[in-house]
Amino acid sequence: MAAAPVSSDIRPISHQSTNDKVFALVMPYVRGGARVVDVGAGEGYFSKMVGDRFAAETGRAPNTVLAACDLFPEFFRYDGIRCDPINADGSLPYRDGAFDVACSLEVIEHIKDQFAFTRELYRVVRPGGVAIVSTPNVLNLNSRVRYLHSGFTVLFDPLLMSSDDPRHTAGHINPVPYYYLAYQLRRAGFRSVTAHYDRFKTSARALLAAWGPFIGVAHGLFRRRLAVKKPDVVAENADMLRELNSVRMLTSRSVIAVATK
C-alpha cells in the first residue's frame, strides 16, 4: 500500500512518485525491524512518510528504527526524529554498519565527489544490508533527445558561474546515468545492484514508438562490437548493459538503484 502524500508544509526534495516508489521498497525492511537512515533528508518529507506509517502500524516511536542526516539539519522539520549533521568532509556521522538500509532520494546529482558518497553509504550499511539511491533518469528518451539538440539532459541546465547559490541551479551539478551509478556502487563494495523506477512518462513512450527499432538495432551492434573487442568488460557488466536500453529505462522519470552489501 502506497503512502498518502505528507499533509503538512514540509516540502519534498523529490517528485511524489519517487517518494512513493522508494517508500514501497523501504517499508518491508522497516516492518521487519530494520534500522533505516535517510541521507540528505532535506526538510524531512520522506522521513515523515516512513516514520508516520511505522508509528501508525506499530504504535512505536519512529526514532526506534529511523534516523536522518543532512548538510543543513537546521532546515529539517519533521519532529518524529532528529536530523544529524553530515560532517564537513562529507562523511556520515555514524559508525560502520550502523544501519540495515541507507536511503538517498535525489541527492547524488548534487554531490561533487560521488565515489566518496557511495563509499560512505557502503560503510554505514551492515553486511547483507542495502543502499537505495534515486536520481533523475538522464537515459530516458526525453533526456536523450534534449541532449542531442541542446547538450543538456533533462533537469540539468547551464550553471551560473558567478554564484554557488544552489537556488540558481537547483543544486544539479553532476548528472549520473544509471550505468555509472551502478558502477560507483559496485566499486564501493556492494556485491549487486538492481534498477527500479518511479513513473513512466507518456511523452517518452511516444518517442519510443518512433525511435525504438533504431535504438534496438544500434544497441545490438554496439554490444556485438564490444563483445569482440572487450569480452571481459561485457562479462563483468552484462546485467548493467542489458538495463540501459530497456523499455523501463527509456521511459521512466527517475531511476532507483538498490545495492546489496
Which role fits each region the language model picked out?
Residues 29-32, 251:
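Flexible, charged surface loops at secondary-structure boundaries
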Residues 7-17, 45, 49, 85, ...:
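S-adenosyl-L-methionine-dependent methyltransferase catalytic module, highlighting the catalytic core
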Residues 23-27, 34-146, 177, 182, ...:
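Conserved SAM-binding loop
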